[in-house]
Amino acid sequence: MDGDRHHGDRGPVHARDRDLIRSRIGTGHASLNLVPRVAQSRMRAPVARGSLLRPGTGSKGSHCEQGLGRGREGMAQSVRSPIGSTFTTMERASMESVFGRRLRGLIAVPLLATLLGAAQAETVIRYGISLADIPLTTGQPDRGAGAYQFTGHTIYDPLIAWEANVDTRPGKLIPGLATDWKVDPKDQKVWRFTLRKGVKFHDGSDFKADAVVWNLAKVLDDKSPQFDAKQAAQVKPRIPSIASYKVIDDYTVEITTKDVDALFPYQLPWFLISSPAQWEKVGRDWAKFASTPSGTGPFKLDKLVPRERADLVRNAAYWDKTRLARVDRLVLVPIPDALTRANALLNGQVDLIETPPPDVVPQLQSSGFRIVQNVTPHVWPYHFSTYPGSPWTDIRVRKAANLAIDRDAIVKLLNGLASPAKGQLDKTSPWFGKPTFDIKYDLPQARALMAQAGYSKANPIKAKVIIAQGGTGQMLSLPMNEFMQQSLAEIGIDVEFEVVELETLYLHWRSGAKADMNAGKGITAINLAYVTADPFYALTRFEYSKYVAPNGVNWGGYANPQVDAAIDKIKTTFVAKDQDALLAYIHQQMVDDALMIWVVHDTNPHALSPKVKHFVQAQHWFQDLTTIGL
């Protein structure tokens, strides 16, 4: 074959792998390094009739041509599976990096000379991240919640922050650019924020109340001159409660919510504040601002090369002296392929990576690399559409789908880097409640429910699910989805996939199941990993009928009057223990209604080279990159 070259007994080196590595990291001599692939034998059942991961199909072009070179544009391609699967080369290679033939060797990543060329006086750490591109740097990152740790909470600060520099317990809300926030006892829709004094943006301008209101208009007021549709698309669904805002004085801001909402503070860690002065300086151009951004965060952006790297340098003048960065320079290197990331780490081209391939973890550990993971508020689900015409409107089908999944087998597939899900939340959560529907692997019960609904393996119901090629938080998207496809086929659910780039998946998610881009293509479920750290992010945004897309991210149109009543009540409940009781009831109803297929909770693993001595793995999807040090 033209794409294979053999090097002694170390197995084939594929041209597509070599092209990807060179396009991502650089050029140079490539050595070989033993990195095993996940074997198909770890699947619970053999692939039948062809599958999502079927080798030997795909369109022409290298990884670089098909994926990396397209920047922020999506790569939506309809994928029919089983029978007649078609994929881009990038998709196929990503799949084969986990399944297909076991390779005994993989090309090593060439030395990235430009990354090693930093001044020796600097302390530098290079971080291989799982995204295909650097997230937006203008203030509101794209590419999902995980991107906030890279170009969000590094360059910028929120009014209210998440405590992400502790690993022994869940973090909590803490003061950010606001030192205090209170609800008006006379009108509980009004919140007053006292701002931190003495804070400066990276450009030297002062942070004051005008900047807060200016930034709110930037994402909420499409008539304002600074409005940025790209940033608004990222954050507007995350701050749905805001109705209006105004300056009281230089260090006081008032925000009014649409309704009384005791949970409103949980929305504000997502709202980050850019410098109005810098925007003016670059000619009121957000594209230019992206190259020379200015926030108040612990890092400054020194260099940005789209799809290649972002250099963050320590902000020595950062206002929070307890959170100064441990290194002078942190280089973010997008490496979306998991095996390529692992080889970059093994060969010294990066110093730490996120989401190492599960089968490579033993080799990394035996080579002296440290694997760090922790309890993580995160779930990997299928989120159903419950609109008329969807195959998931029948609760028997939704419950059967949950009972068809062998979650222990998926955890084994992931080499233990996950835990089985019993719902949206981990059972240890105070908000788990007491659901009557016990989510487990029970194939006979699943088949019985499908029979009651009128379906079987011989007479299947068809469903189309939109999924990501990969990306931060999506775990091993393609092999896990093949496992799901096979498992659901066993009970009479014939799944077809639409495979897209992660940012495109987010567009489909924000638009809602009823949107033409979903309903028009027959898409009735979405596989998108969710952060579940707080009441809003874990529960209410998915269940409240007032948050049906595009007003929020109740993607599937779920509406339960009892749940709505509980959410209305919690929004007027300011006592924590009473909130906990209501949240437990809400989660209990969510599980009993089988709103999603809940599969596993991620443990958010990172692999660190021996030179990295410091890294606090928070019990959160946000990680504080200031804790990384030599």
Residue ranges and their predicted role:
Residues 89, 194, 232-279, 303:
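Surface-exposed binding/hinge segments that line
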Residues 127, 306, 451-530, 541, ...:
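Ligand/substrate-recognition segments at binding pockets and active sites
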Residues 129-186, 294:
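N-terminal lobe/hinge region of extracytoplasmic solute-binding protein
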Residues 163-168, 269-325, 329, 339, ...:
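Gly/Pro-rich hinge or "lid" segments in bacterial periplasmic/extracellular proteins
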Residues 287-290, 317-363, 494:
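Ligand-site clamp/hinge motif
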Residues 311-316, 365, 393-491, 557-561, ...:
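Append "and occasionally in soluble cytosolic enzymes with long acidic Gly/Pro-rich linkers
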Residues 399, 411, 494-507, 537-610:
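Extracytoplasmic/peripheral linker and loop segments enriched in polar/acidic and small residues
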Residues 606-630:
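Long beta-strand-rich cores associated with HINT superfamily self-processing modules
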